[in-house]
A protein has these predicted regions:
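Conserved anchor residues at repeat-unit boundaries in beta-strand-based tandem repeats, strongest
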Residues: 1-11, 23-34, 46-58, 69-80, ...
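Conserved small/polar residues in nucleotide/adenosyl-binding loops
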Residues: 196-199
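Aromatic (phenylalanine/tyrosine) cluster motif
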Residues: 32, 39-41, 64, 144
């Protein structure tokens, strides 16, 4: 350790090097990383932000060795609150976090132009949400475990629309299919196949 001491404790500004190659440069309080500081991990990751009693706390940016990045709030060492995660693939999530997971309200942008905007539970699209497809199609409704499940509306680019129940990403249950030409089919669906058509 190189830095300031007060009463035999690391206090103020200092640098600490671990045997595994990790390093912290920043503020200390009573032997704890506390305040503003940068932690360089042995695996190439880096965290630049606020600390409280050796834990990431408050605003901070975590740079992953693979090129991914998280910029947002932390609590007790975990992503918590509002934050943006950028994957090396080009995908990006902007929204709420809880206990290191996408949780609450948020939007996930994909490199192909598609995006999901809605509710999340433990890294899964779950609750109410809208998925905008890159080809112009759109689904608005309920989700469970990253799949369309419950009540929802799917609109195709050509103007066709399905309003009804979904299960496991497929039209399943009671629903109405509206054709762009004005025709409609109403009835029961099983795994995206309509059986009881009523015109």
């Amino acid at each position: 350790y190189k830095g300031d001491w007060v009463n035999d404790k690391k206090q103020g500004w200092g640098t600490y090097d671990w045997q595994d190659g990790s390093r912290y440069e920043g503020q200390w309080n009573g032997d704890y990383m506390h305040g503003q500081g940068v932690f360089y991990y042995a695996n190439g990751d880096k965290y630049d932000g606020q600390w409280e009693n050796d834990h990431k706390q408050g605003p901070g940016i975590y740079y992953f060795a693979d090129g991914s990045k998280y910029d947002g709030q932390w609590e007790n060492g975990k992503k918590q609150g509002q934050g943006t995660y950028q994957w090396k693939s080009g995908s990006r999530y902007e929204g709420q976090w809880k206990n290191d997971c996408m949780h609450g309200q948020g939007t996930l942008y994909h490199p192909d132009g598609s995006k999901y905007k809605g509710q999340w539970v433990n890294d899964k699209q779950q609750g109410e949400g809208i998925y905008y497809y890159a080809n112009g199609c759109r689904y608005e409704g309920q989700w469970f475990d990253d799949k369309k499940q419950g009540q929802g509306t799917f609109t195709w680019v050509n103007g066709d629309k399905y309003v009804g129940q979904w299960m496991n990403d497929r039209m399943h249950g009671q629903g109405i299919y509206y054709h762009a030409d004005g025709n409609k089919y109403e009835g029961q669906w099983v795994n995206a196949v309509s059986y009881t058509h009523l015109t």
